[in-house]
Amino acid sequence: MILPVVFLCLTAVVPLSTGEEPEDFDALSTNRTDQQNLIVDTHNTLRRGVKPTASNMLKMEWYAPAAKNAQNWANQCTLSHSPANMRRTSVQCGENLFMSSGPFSWSDVIQSWYNEEEDFEYGTGAKTQGAVIGHYTQVVWYNSYQIGCAVAFCPNRTYKYFYVCQYCPMGNLISSIQTPYKNGEPCGDCPDACDDGLCTKL
C-alpha cells in the first residue's frame, strides 16, 4: 500500500505565565459543548472566507472519535506530533498543534494557524522557501470536514498548554498542497447541498 506524504505542523508561543493552572482552565475543555461549537464555527467562518473562493469546501462538524484521540495525545504532554496510529478513526486524520506558556482561547489558536495564509499563494504554495503554511492548509483542506480538539495542562513543561486538533480525513497531501481546495464559485460543486457558502456533501 502506498501511503500519501503529508505535512504535519506545530506552533509555539511564549507569553508571560505564572506557571500555575488558572482557575478557569476547565473553560477551555472540549468536553464543553460551547467550546466544541466555537471550534467548529471558527473553522467554518475561516473556510467560508478563503481567497480565492472555494467551490468544494465542506462544512466542518465536531467528531467525537477525533476529539478522544486528540485528548489522549494532549495528555501525554510530549509537545510533538502523535504517531499515525493515534490519528486514526475510520480514516487517517491530520493534526495541528499549538503550545504556549499561558492559556489562549480556541479562536485565537485557530486564527494563529490560519494566519499562515499570509505566506501562502493559491496554486503556488509557500511564497518563500521554508515558510510554514501547513497549519493554514490543513484548516482549509476542502474535504477535512470532521474535527476533534483537546487541550492539556503540562505543568513541568516550558510550554504548559498543549492544544491538539485532529482533522478527518487528513489534508496536506504533498501532491496537492498548493491547492487545498478547488477555486470557483462558493458551493459550485454542491449546488443542491449548500449552507452559506459551504458544502454539506459533495
PLM regions and their residue ranges:
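Mature extracellular or exoplasmic CAP/SCP-family domains and secreted bioactive peptides
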Residues: 2-202
